[in-house]
């Protein structure tokens, strides 16, 4: 069961108009995040990023946290996801317009949401990084949206294949480290954590933000900037972040080995991340949504 424009329906019954500008011109954005025992982690940050993107695309839609929580609770029940552990995709496209390809504000967006049951034990615990020959494209606007424009990522995925143990790493046109195909990238050298800055054209990832705001809690400095590949390849450890996969260490990038276990910073950040998830579940009641079934 999925949600489309205020209604819950079977996937086979869902219909999107061929005149939706999300389909015709790629005008749409989405958020992907994770539910832990029915609770969405860092939802406020996902909403904040979504609202910024909608404003940039001139899609008029008020993102109501209360409505999203109700939507998620109902989708969990309708899909019989009893433990509340799921992957969520919330998608908002421009919707139908009869004005053609002209500058306009979209006031009838298409809102779609679906959840997939997630088994934590099925997720990878580590990754191998491969530097991509295809370069990261620049954002279509002034900043990277989590939008329908995924051609650059698709070409990158074709280059490295579909092995879930491998993540492709983009460089910018001038050779600076950018981001992964589905992740942000971090590394530690000595007592400092490094990650590419937003001016490399990367997505402002939610888990990336978590690390930037909490690095001091594990006693490490954090710097953002434009860094050559050599900085990553000479690091003491490296890892990737993703809202569903969380914080995943790289065991190697190209021919550089970082070891088979999480490094000092990776382990500390993983523990901090898990702690915040547990605190959230405790504060929000965790499986309480099941009592209303």
UniProtKB/Swiss-Prot annotation:
Enzyme class: lyase
Pfam family, any one: Aminotran_4
GO molecular function: 4-amino-4-deoxychorismate lyase activity; pyridoxal phosphate binding
Catalytic reaction annotation: 4-amino-4-deoxychorismate = 4-aminobenzoate + pyruvate + H(+)
EC number: 4.1.3.38
GO CC annotations on file: cytosol
Loss of function: phenotype: Requires p-aminobenzoic acid for growth.
The protein's annotated pathway: Cofactor biosynthesis; tetrahydrofolate biosynthesis; 4-aminobenzoate from chorismate: step 2/2
Keywords recorded for this protein, A-Z: Folate biosynthesis, Lyase, Pyridoxal phosphate
Cofactor entry: pyridoxal 5'-phosphate
BP term (GO), one: carboxylic acid metabolic process
N6-(pyridoxal phosphate)lysine: residues bearing it: 146
Similarity remark: Belongs to the class-IV pyridoxal-phosphate-dependent aminotransferase family.
Protein role: Involved in the biosynthesis of p-aminobenzoate (PABA), a precursor of tetrahydrofolate. Converts 4-amino-4-deoxychorismate into 4-aminobenzoate (PABA) and pyruvate.
Cross-referenced PANTHER family: AMINO-ACID AMINOTRANSFERASE, AMINODEOXYCHORISMATE LYASE
Quaternary structure and partners: Homodimer.
NCBIfam families (alphabetical): PRK07650.1
Protein name per its UniProtKB record: Aminodeoxychorismate lyase
């Amino acid at each position: 069961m999925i949600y489309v424009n205020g209604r819950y329906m079977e996937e086979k019954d869902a219909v999107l108009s061929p005149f939706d500008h999300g389909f015709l011109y790629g005008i749409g954005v989405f958020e992907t995040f994770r539910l832990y025992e029915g609770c969405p982690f860092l939802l406020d940050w996902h909403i904040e990023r979504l609202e910024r993107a909608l404003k940039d695309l001139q899609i008029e839609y008020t993102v109501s946290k209360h409505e999203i929580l109700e939507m998620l609770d109902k989708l969990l029940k309708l899909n019989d996801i009893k433990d509340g552990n799921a992957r969520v995709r919330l998608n908002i496209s421009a919707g139908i317009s009869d004005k053609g390809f002209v500058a306009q504000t979209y006031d009838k967006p298409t809102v779609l949401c679906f959840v997939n049951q997630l088994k934590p034990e099925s997720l990878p615990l580590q990754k191998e990084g491969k530097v991509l020959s295809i370069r990261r494209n620049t954002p279509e606007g002034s900043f990277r949206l989590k939008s329908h424009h995924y051609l650059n990522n698709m070409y990158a995925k074709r280059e490295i294949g579909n092995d879930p143990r491998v993540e492709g790493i983009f460089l910018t046109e001038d050779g600076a480290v950018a981001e992964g195909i589905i992740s942000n990238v971090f590394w530690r050298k000595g007592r400092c954590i490094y990650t590419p800055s937003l001016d490399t054209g990367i997505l402002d990832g939610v888990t990336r933000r978590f690390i930037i705001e909490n690095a001091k809690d594990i006693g490490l400095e954090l710097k953002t900037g434009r860094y050559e590949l050599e900085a990553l390849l000479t690091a003491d450890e490296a890892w990737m972040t993703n809202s569903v996969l969380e914080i995943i260490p790289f065991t190697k990038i190209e021919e550089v080995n970082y070891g088979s276990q999480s490094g000092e910073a990776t382990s500390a950040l993983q523990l901090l991340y898990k702690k915040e998830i547990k605190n959230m579940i405790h504060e929000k009641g965790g499986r309480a949504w099941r009592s209303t079934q």
